[in-house]
């Protein structure tokens, strides 16, 4: 008898452990390390080689071409430069964290003048600057536009590996005395669980939560000058993140996304020929009746209403009414 009891207890422990591990997420997927971030770059450039789809006669474009040719050693004084084969563009790119000089990055090119298409154009050498106005990359190359060029959006395109990083993004992460994690979705429960799990993994009280979204980690002596290894260890730790009970509905598309913790109290709703009862209730003479137990989830309610053929629009209206009545326990976000 004892063996059977022990077996059942062990089976239950393993079952719930599997459930927890199925919901677990790595810290690297729910948090970011302060200082490890991408940087946006932007620049103004000129596209040439267009087949009559450029800006044409434009004072702004004319001055840009004269200035560009002047840098190439061609002096053009009082020249009104007009061509339908060139276009003024804005070039944008995202520089990855720890990007190094010589590494290529993709760029986006968008027309800002009267050009009708950038198809077949070539971007001339364009410096890309960060928010501090320092040049971090230089772009150049042939523009690629998706699709067949007829029905696609031809005033914007991409150049894969079209820019080369010219300056390193410097940051020393190997010898820091403290690191800071920022939760992508701040939550006190998730922060507390993260601290407990990190301290258990590191074998001491090294992590502490400053608020619902900030966790500070003191570098253990065993990881001194080994910050990369420490962060790799922390990133791989699995946490069961908590989340608010929330229902998100999109009225335009009829899409409904429901969190697993959203519950509904006892409530009765009449919507046209439809009657919805959550809690004590029996089917009456209504044309369409849905009777559910008190404390059911929104998912169970939606499933029951779907069986009755309720349209997405009516579903959203019913959920909004339940929320207004105070019977829906969670946030209702309408997009």
UniProtKB/Swiss-Prot annotation:
Any single Gene Ontology cellular-component annotation: outer membrane-bounded periplasmic space
Keyword Signal assigned: yes
GO MF: structural molecule activity
Main location: periplasm
GO biological process: bacterial-type flagellum-dependent cell motility
Tagged with keyword Signal: yes
Cell compartments where the protein resides: Periplasm; Bacterial flagellum basal body
InterPro entries (alphabetical): Flag_FlgI
Domain of life: Bacteria
UniProt KW keywords: Bacterial flagellum, Periplasm, Signal
Signal peptide: 1-24
Pfam annotation, one family: FlgI
Function: Assembles around the rod to form the L-ring and probably protects the motor/basal body from shearing forces during rotation.
Subunit structure as annotated in this protein's UniProt entry: The basal body constitutes a major portion of the flagellar organelle and consists of four rings (L,P,S, and M) mounted on a central rod.
Protein family: Belongs to the FlgI family.
Protein name: Flagellar P-ring protein
């Amino acid at each position: 008898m004892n063996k059977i009891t022990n077996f059942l207890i062990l089976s239950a422990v393993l079952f719930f452990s599997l459930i927890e591990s199925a919901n677990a997420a790595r810290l690297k997927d729910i948090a970011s390390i302060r200082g490890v971030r991408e940087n946006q770059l932007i620049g103004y450039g000129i596209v040439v080689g267009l087949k009559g789809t450029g800006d044409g006669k434009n004072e702004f474009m004319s001055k840009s071409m004269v200035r560009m040719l002047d840098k190439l050693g061609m002096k053009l004084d009082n020249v009104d430069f007009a061509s339908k084969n060139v276009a003024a563009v804005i070039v944008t790119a995202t520089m990855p964290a720890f990007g190094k000089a010589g590494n290529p990055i993709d760029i986006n090119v968008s027309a800002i003048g009267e050009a009708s298409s950038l198809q077949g154009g070539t971007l001339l050498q364009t410096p890309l600057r960060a928010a501090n106005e320092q040049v971090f990359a230089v772009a150049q190359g042939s523009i690629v536009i998706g699709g067949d060029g007829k029905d696609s959006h031809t005033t914007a395109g991409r150049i894969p590996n079209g820019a080369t990083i010219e300056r390193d993004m410097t940051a020393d992460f190997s010898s820091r005395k403290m690191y800071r994690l920022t939760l992508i979705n701040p939550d006190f429960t998730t922060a507390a669980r993260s601290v407990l799990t990190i301290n258990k993994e590191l074998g001491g009280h090294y992590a502490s939560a400053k608020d619902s979204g900030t966790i500070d980690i003191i570098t253990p002596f065993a990881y001194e000058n080994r910050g990369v290894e420490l962060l790799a260890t922390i990133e791989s730790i699995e946490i069961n993140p908590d989340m608010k009970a929330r229902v998100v509905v999109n009225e335009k598309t009829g899409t409904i996304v429901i969190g697993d913790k959203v519950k509904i109290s006892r409530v009765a709703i009449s919507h046209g020929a439809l009657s919805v009862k959550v809690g004590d209730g029996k089917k009456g003479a209504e044309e369409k009746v849905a009777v559910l137990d008190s404390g059911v989830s929104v998912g169970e309610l939606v499933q029951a209403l779907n069986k009755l053929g309720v349209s997405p629009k009516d579903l959203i209206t019913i959920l909004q009414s339940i929320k207004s009545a105070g019977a829906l326990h969670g946030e209702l976000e309408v997009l």
